[in-house]
Amino acid sequence: MRTLCLYYTRTNTTKAVMENIAKIIGADVAEYTDGKNRSGFLGYVGACFATVNNTILKVYIRDKIDLKSYDHVIIGMPVWAEGPCAIGRALIKKYSSSMPSEVYYVVTHMGGKNDYMDKIKAMDMLLGRPSSGQVSIRTKENDYIKESALFAETLI
C-alpha cells in the first residue's frame, strides 16, 4: 500500500508533523503551495485574509506526483483565522477527482480548547465524500511530534 503525506506549511511546524507521520508509516512526502511567500507578520495577515475570504486562486504540488498511484493520501495543513487554511481547502477542491479512496486530514493549530473537528469534517464537501479520518494537533505548548506519532500508529 502506497501512502503520500501532503503538507502546506508557513512556519515549518506542519512540515515537521507530516514528516514524522511519513517516517513512522513509511510514506512519501510532498509539499503543496500557492506559490506565495507567507513568512513573517504580513504573510500571516495575508494568509488569514485569504482563509476568511477564500481567495486562493491557484494551488499546486511542488513535485510531480501522480495522486492516483497512491492508496492513501494524508493532507496536512495549519489553521488560519479559526479554520483550515485556504490553500489546503483549494488543494482538496482542485485534486478531489484524483485522490485515492482513502484520504485523511491532519490539521495543526496553536491551541485553546477548540479542536476544529467540525470545520475539518466540512472539508469532506470539497472532497465529495467522507474522509477516512481526521486529527487536530495543537502545536503551542504541546508535544506535537508525540501527538502526530500517536495518530500515525493508528494508520499502521
Which sequence ranges carry the predicted segments?
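Residue-level signal for short, function-critical loop segments
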Residues: T9-T11, V79, V107-M110
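Short, conserved loop/helix-junction motifs that constitute active-site signature segments
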Residues: L67-K68, K93-E102, L127
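Charged helix-capping and loop-helix junction motifs
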Residues: I87-K93, D118-K121, E147-A152
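Glycine-rich phosphate/pyrophosphate-binding loop and the adjoining helix
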Residues: P130-I156
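Structural beta-sheet core signal
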Residues: C5, I75, Y104-V107
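N-terminal beta1-alpha1-beta2 submodule of the flavodoxin-like/Rossmannoid cofactor-binding fold
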Residues: M1-V73, E82-C85, G128-P130, E153-I156
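Short, glycine-/small-residue-rich phosphate/pyrophosphate-handling segment
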Residues: Y104-K140
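Short aromatic-enriched loop/helix-cap "lid" or pocket-rim segments at secondary-structure transitions
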Residues: G40-Y44, M117-D118, K146-E147
